């Protein structure tokens, strides 16, 4: 950021500022996939390519979506990970099976199980990438890896993790301590909105509050 203050002949000050960025790469790639996608609605997605200023530039992007390994059971994330573990993972799971050992809930640490779909797209074509009928997504955790080359031939890689849930199913989409979903994010007067709660734990009590502004309805 550069700030310039100039005084004119009348002694009045005028301020002007400009911002700029410096980067080792001239291309950024991203996608339109949300952190949590609804199974029935996940039929297409887009891939974007931009320069450092955020302006669109055409690029050929290779992409691949992978299914990730799920934990064997749900765990609650610890408030703070120990600097040094005094127990092995196996010992900890026997002592505190519901309390995470460290990285169980971190998607970035999950192993890849299988490749679901892959392809290549030129971002000059703004048509969304359709998920074919032969591609079978299920509820769970996924990872998309995208690769492209900038104008200097440097390879750019972007990785994003996401989950797929099914609001029509009575089963948990994946092992987790709590699950909350709405049938719609907005509604008109007289409409009905279904609220779904879930947990992989048994004998769970749910406390909830419905508010309008700061006033509690329920």
Segments (PLM) and residue ranges:
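A structural signal for beta-strand and strand-to-loop patches characteristic of beta-rich domains
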Residues: 1-218
């Amino acid at each position: 950021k550069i700030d310039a203050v100039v005084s004119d002949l009348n002694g009045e000050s005028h301020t002007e500022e400009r911002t700029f960025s410096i980067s080792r790469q001239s291309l950024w790639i991203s996608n339109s996939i949300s952190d949590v996608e609804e199974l029935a609605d996940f039929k297409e997605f887009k891939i974007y390519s931009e320069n450092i200023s955020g302006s669109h530039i055409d690029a050929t992007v290779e992409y691949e979506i992978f299914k990730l390994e799920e934990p064997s059971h749900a765990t609650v994330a610890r408030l703070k990970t120990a600097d040094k573990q005094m127990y092995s993972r196996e010992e900890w799971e026997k002592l505190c099976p519901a309390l995470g050992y460290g990285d169980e809930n971190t998607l970035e640490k999950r192993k890849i199980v299988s490749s679901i779909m892959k392809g290549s797209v030129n971002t000059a074509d703004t048509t969304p990438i359709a998920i074919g009928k032969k591609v079978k997504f299920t509820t769970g955790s996924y990872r998309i890896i995208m690769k492209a080359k900038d104008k200097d031939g440097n390879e750019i890689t972007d990785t994003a993790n996401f989950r797929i849930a099914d609001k029509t199913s009575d089963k948990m989409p994946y092992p987790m301590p709590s699950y909350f979903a709405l049938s719609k994010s907005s509604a008109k007067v007289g409409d009905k909105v279904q609220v779904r709660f879930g947990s992989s734990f048994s004998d769970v009590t749910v406390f909830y509050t419905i508010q309008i502004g700061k006033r509690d309805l329920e």
